[in-house]
């Protein structure tokens, strides 16, 4: 009835729905489209309804299956409970046979264990063969190692449990030992081939190093276990100090066990072996180079260059494959450097057979190697080990000695040529010879060559060699200067003055450029300054020799002989002398630089003063009023002449001694003598009392007693000024006065 009611309700609902859809007559035309839409919806509803019905059917089937399974399980549980009840009843009857059951159980367990051990022993050869087969694949090296390590574990366990059967068990592990040998040969082959593998198959190298690391860890673990076992044994011996029954056998067994433990504690040492393999590989890499050193230097240096460049690849490819704590790049740098030092020592053994060009090629390669290391981040001090190891010393010695010999031969030829060839003139008329410029051009070239092609230590050696060359050159020039001035001549001496001043400037330039190129630690050991000043000393000597040329002039000698004689008193000496000086000064001023000319004038003035003082002390005529007046006029003539060339203060400071001696010669009393002499000692502290004695002896009318008193008083004044028996300083006059030099020794003996 309910179904019929539902049908009626559905029909009425449908009529209402149609009435809503067709409220107007003109909408009857759309009945066909409405009908089509209705059919489509009906089909969709049918499909959805079919799907829902199917799902409900499947769920009902699953529920039936679960119900059936549950029923089956319940039946099984019921059977099990029944079996348990039966077994419990049976066990109640076995309590009386418990001991026999326990023995049977133990026997069964032992049998199972024995079978398992036998199976394990029988599998050793199979596992060893499998490990050996896996060695053919580089990718399996770690797995192979793990298999072999597992076999080693079995061996340790078996040998520990075997007791007296150890000898019989060892043969089962011989195959394992052979496999280990093959494995280690493969492993160390990979390590030795580190350079090639790092580029072509880095993963193979990494796996090999992983094995090394794993073995190191295992060695550490075994060492710790052995240490713990040893500690436990020691504690046991402390806890049981008296065991008289089995002392000897127990002791021997324990000592043997300890020996085996110590052997195990040492481990395989794979890391050390890894380093050793690398060292051997490096040695093999250098074998060809160390042979080429004796056969073909060019090929040897090319080979060395190629080997040195490998360090870049080692930095980029090899080092990343190794654990950082191995510091493999630093190790490689040390190993390579050691071998290169060996190469340099072999080359040094035949240094005399190598040309300078070949030596420079060797040092040039060392520079390249050092720069390569520095570019790779190696510290400068470590990069320079090759050059500072001493291995290059014979090479550098040979180069430096040849350079010094060649340079010396050259400048000696130049100096000999200067003796016969007239000096050249600049546009300003200054005299010179090419020796100075040529010498420093050659020395500068040597420095530049070494800077461009060699090491810091080689440049340091060249700097020292150049200093020695300059010292030798100065010595050769001094030898030339020491020749009689008249033999040398005015113009060559003027050229020598200019040359040495030019040498000083060039030497300072070379010094500055060389010291700038040297590292500070080497620059501090090189003293160019004193050597450079040596050229100024030679120039100074040449200036004095130029003055001697004037004073050795026959015309000048003729005038000087007349000093303090009749012609001198008549004004026929000093006036003519300064006129001659004027002629010479005109030439010298044109020939030399202004600074040298002023020094020349000062030297000439000093020599003039010395000559006048010397002649004053050696002349035999009594000093009269006209003598004193002429001396005063001489001072004026000399003052007027020399201050045309140098400052008046310099002239006055040098002429002053002539004025003081004039006053001393004209003194009338003891106080006057001592006062003037004291004034002289203030600016000429080396003026001996003998000067007073000579001048007093040339005075008329002074009694002998007064003369002795004056001399004695002056000697006491002089002695009081001495410091440690010597004058506080030396002046320019009295050490050069000839008449005093001859009697100086006896005078000093009297004073002391």
From Swiss-Prot:
InterPro entries given in the database record: EXOC3/Sec6 (IPR010326), EXOC3/Sec6_C (IPR042532)
Phenotype of the disrupted gene, per the record: Male gametophytic lethal due to defect in pollen germination and pollen tube growth.
Residues that bear N-acetylmethionine: 1
BP GO annotations: exocytosis
Biased composition regions of type Low complexity, renumbered to the chain: 247-256
Function: Component of the exocyst complex involved in the docking of exocytic vesicles with fusion sites on the plasma membrane during regulated or polarized secretion. Involved in polarized cell growth and organ morphogenesis. During cytokinesis, involved in cell plate initiation, cell plate maturation and formation of new primary cell wall.
PANTHER family: EXOCYST COMPLEX COMPONENT 3, EXOCYST COMPLEX COMPONENT SEC6-RELATED
Description of how the protein assembles with itself and partners: The exocyst complex is composed of SEC3, SEC5, SEC6, SEC8, SEC10, EXO70A1 and EXO84B. Interacts with EXO84B and KEU (via C-terminus). Binds to EXO70E2. Binds directly to B1L.
Family from the record: Belongs to the SEC6 family.
Protein name, per record: Exocyst complex component SEC6
Taxonomic source organism: Arabidopsis thaliana (Mouse-ear cress)
């Amino acid at each position: 009835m309910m179904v019929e009611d539902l049908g009626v309700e559905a029909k009425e609902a449908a009529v209402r729905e149609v009435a809503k859809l067709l409220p107007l007559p003109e909408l009857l035309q759309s009945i066909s489209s409405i009908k089509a839409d209705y059919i489509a919806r009906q089909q969709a509803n049918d499909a959805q309804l079919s799907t829902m019905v199917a799902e409900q059917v499947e769920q009902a089937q699953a529920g039936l299956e679960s119900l059936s399974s549950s029923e089956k399980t319940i039946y099984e549980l019921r059977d099990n409970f029944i079996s348990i009840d039966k077994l419990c009843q049976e066990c109640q009857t076995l309590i009386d046979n418990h001991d026999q059951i326990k023995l049977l159980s133990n026997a069964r367990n032992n049998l199972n264990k024995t079978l398992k051990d036998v199976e394990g022993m029988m599998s050793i050869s199979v596992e060893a063969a499998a490990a050996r087969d896996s060695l053919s694949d580089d990718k399996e090296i770690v797995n192979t190692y793990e298999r072999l390590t597992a076999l080693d574990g079995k061996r340790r366990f078996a040998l520990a449990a075997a007791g007296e059967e150890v000898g019989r068990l060892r043969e089962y592990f011989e195959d394992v030992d052979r496999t280990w040998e093959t494995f280690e040969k493969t492993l160390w082959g990979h390590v030795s081939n580190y350079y090639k593998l790092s580029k072509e198959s880095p993963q193979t190298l990494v796996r090999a190093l992983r094995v090394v690391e794993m073995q190191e860890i295992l060695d550490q673990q075994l060492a710790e276990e052995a240490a713990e076992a040893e500690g436990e044994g020691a504690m046991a011996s402390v806890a049981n100090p008296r065991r008289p029954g089995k002392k000897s056998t127990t002791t021997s067994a324990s000592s043997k066990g300890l020996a085996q433990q110590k052997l195990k504690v040492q481990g395989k040492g794979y890391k050390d072996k890894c380093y050793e393999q690398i060292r051997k590989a490096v040695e093999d890499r250098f074998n060809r180079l160390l042979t080429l050193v004796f056969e073909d230097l060019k090929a040897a240096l090319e080979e060395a260059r190629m080997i040195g460049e490998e360090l870049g690849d080692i930095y980029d490819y090899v080092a990343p494959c190794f654990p950082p704590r191995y510091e493999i790049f630093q190790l490689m740098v040390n190993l390579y450097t050691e071998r290169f030092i060996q190469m340099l020592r072999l080359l040094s053994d035949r240094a005399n057979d190598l040309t300078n060009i070949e030596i420079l090629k060797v040092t040039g390669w060392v520079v390249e190697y050092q720069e390569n290391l520095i570019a790779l981040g190696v510290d400068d001090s470590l990069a320079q080990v090759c050059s500072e190891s001493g291995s290059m010393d014979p090479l550098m010695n040979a180069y430096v000695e040849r350079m010094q010999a060649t340079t010396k031969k050259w400048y000696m030829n130049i100096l000999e040529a200067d003796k016969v060839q007239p000096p050249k003139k600049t546009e300003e008329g200054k005299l010179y010879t090419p020796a100075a410029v040529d010498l420093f051009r050659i020395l500068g070239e040597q420095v530049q060559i070494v800077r461009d092609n060699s090491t810091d230590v080689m440049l340091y050696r060249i700097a020292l060699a150049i200093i020695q060359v300059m010292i030798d050159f100065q010595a050769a020039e001094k030898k030339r200067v020491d020749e009689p001035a008249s033999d040398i001549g005015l113009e060559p001496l003027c050229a020598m003055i200019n040359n040495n001043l030019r040498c000083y400037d060039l030497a300072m330039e070379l010094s500055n450029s060389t010291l700038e190129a040297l590292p500070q630690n080497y620059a501090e050991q090189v003293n160019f300054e004193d050597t450079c000043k040596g050229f100024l000393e030679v120039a100074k000597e040449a200036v004095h020799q130029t003055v001697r040329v004037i004073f050795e002039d026959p015309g000048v000698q003729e005038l000087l002989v007349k000093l303090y004689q009749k012609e001198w008193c008549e004004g026929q000496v000093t006036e003519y002398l300064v006129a001659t000086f004027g002629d010479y000064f005109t030439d010298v001023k044109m020939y030399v630089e202004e600074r040298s000319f002023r020094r020349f004038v000062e030297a000439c003035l000093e020599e003039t003063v010395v000559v006048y003082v010397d002649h004053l002390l050696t002349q035999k005529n009594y000093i009269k009023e006209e003598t004193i007046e002429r001396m005063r006029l001489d001072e004026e003539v000399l003052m007027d002449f020399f201050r045309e060339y140098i400052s008046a203060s310099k002239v006055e400071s040098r002429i002053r001694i002539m004025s003081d001696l004039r006053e001393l010669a004209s003194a009338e009393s003891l106080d006057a003598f001592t006062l003037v002499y004291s004034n002289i000692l203030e600016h000429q502290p080396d003026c001996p009392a003998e000067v007073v004695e000579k001048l007093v002896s040339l005075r008329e009318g002074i009694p002998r007693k007064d003369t002795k008193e004056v001399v004695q008083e002056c000697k006491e004044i002089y002695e009081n000024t001495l410091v440690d028996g010597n004058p506080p300083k030396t002046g320019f006059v009295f050490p050069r006065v000839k008449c005093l030099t001859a009697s100086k020794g006896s005078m000093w003996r009297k004073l002391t």
